Amino acid sequence: EEFIDLALHAQKMGLQVILVLEMPSELDLILERCKKMGVRPTLGVRFRLSAESAGHWSGSGGDSSMFGLNISQLMRVVDTLREKGMLDCLRMLHYHQGSQIPNIRAIRQAVTEATRVYVGLVSEGARMGILDLGGGLAVSYDGLKGATEGSSNYGTKEYCADVIEAIGEVTAEAGVPHPDIITESGRAIVAYYSVLVINVLDVNRFEPHRQVALEKDAPSLVRNLWELREESRKGPAKTNHERLQEIY
């Protein structure tokens, strides 16, 4: 209740706050707090996709996700909001496909499914306007650009192009205005700037080299080497002749 009240107070202050339903039971609590505080909320729903994904963390999203509403639960939310005269409060559809999705085809399938659900909500009378794609944008750790767990067969530009194209095709076919698109691609943002922090276990120290002086009776070979050393300290040689020195 405190978290919901905080969000509603922020909305009263003029901030744009969207309360996203991740479980069916959350709707009654939100409506109760809204009625007590006299606030019409801005709502979103997290939808549980049926499209299959791939990758090491594929179990955290899609139809097997612990969070999100299936299609029947989503329609019950729509019916409840319609009965309360608050269907216009539903503004956003959100889903989370998983993390590190290596295949662009799986991402496109998920976007297409979610957009069709979005279009269906608009046809039911929901105001909508926002589509949150969640995470999934992969990082090619091995640089091989393959559809494996540690890689991806697409880049950021291809991801953006496929997402926008898929959304545009479905919405245009249904005659629905294009939504504002939100992504939560945290991995793709921070992975390139990772820092390894460890405790210092030990320190090796080295004494500086003792300054050596050229002795007066030094052999000619040593003198030649000394002169080369001194010349190299003055800077790069100007000609090829100055770069060569034959020592006997």
Feature-to-residue mapping (PLM):
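Active-site-proximal beta-alpha core segment in soluble small-molecule metabolic enzymes
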Residues: 1-130, 139, 155-158
